[in-house]
């Protein structure tokens, strides 16, 4: 889930009134005084121009005011927790949410099943999410990867969705843009209705080669078409409406926003799977400008609230570090693409990160690089590592504050 100040000045001008400037009918003077002896009447002094009224103070943005109030009331531990999108543990999930103050939880297929491996009923799943929200001091971001096709978590549960969501390529082949828009609205309605408020989609990677690792998850067309796809999905995903029947039989119409996460910046290209190891992308910066950035730019302009940064090493931006841990890559995201929302790492447990940082320090490096949130299954040790980094002077608390502002702004 991305602030206008109005200024107005009033300028008052005083007209200088000069007597005797108008032309009148000539009159015979009663007496003409001698030269040099006449009393010359001085024109009246002009009244001073009034000072312009001062410009009124801009009205404070209620959302920014609320965010600053929340931030001011948080301890360092609470602020550090907000930086984490925690993969839900199998046991004591509510306790972890409460004790670690995490900003969000990310659900996988297992989280839609009970202990016996059976799909949860809608009622049971909603109760599960409500319990997590009740445990959180600050409302939780509840996320899922519901791309459709090969990556579909929630829609595999037949108690939550009428059918599994299809891939963007399948949808476009069926009914082009109409099917893409209908699917986005359908997914949002059902995700929101059961308590999920963030979808880690759409995939904004440009891939036209079926041999690419990311191809089956991507739109599968060129950069311009992929940009149009991303824009279409984000615009249709901005709101979702559904009708709720209350216990007393009354009907309420609800319209909610769902958070969209564009991925995987700066663009996956034809790189290998970074779940198991490093991928090095040696393409030129010009190719990214002309191709890979287009879908991300389209999604940002359409209002996407978050961008997920990959673990690829992109040599034209940073030849040493994975994009997720690279300040240079985040600078491109902020300055070249003008993104002001929440930057999120890909999962820190993935193999591509392991050789660059130990478990705890990876989160610190991610925040130092410019991420606002990190995805992890080890929030306990990593939250503490952020607290320790601030206490030790490695990480400025102001950097944590700025990240938390973005996270809270996305929530509210």
List each model region and its residues.
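Divalent metal-dependent hydrolysis catalytic cores, especially in the metallo-beta-lactamase
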Residues: 102-110, 197-205, 370, 374
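Substrate-binding cleft of extracellular glycoside hydrolase catalytic domains
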Residues: 136-184
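Second-shell residues forming the walls of enzyme active-site clefts
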Residues: 75, 105, 116-131, 140, ...
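Short, acidic/polar
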Residues: 88-99, 180-190, 288-295, 357-365
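N-terminal hydrophobic targeting/anchoring segments and the immediately downstream early-domain regions
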Residues: 21-156
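Active-site mouth loops of central-metabolism enzymes
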Residues: 82-91, 166-181, 277-291, 351-356
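A substrate-binding/cap region within the structured catalytic cores of diverse enzymes
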Residues: 164-253
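Sec-dependent N-terminal signal peptides of Gram-positive bacterial secreted proteins and lipoproteins
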Residues: 2-25
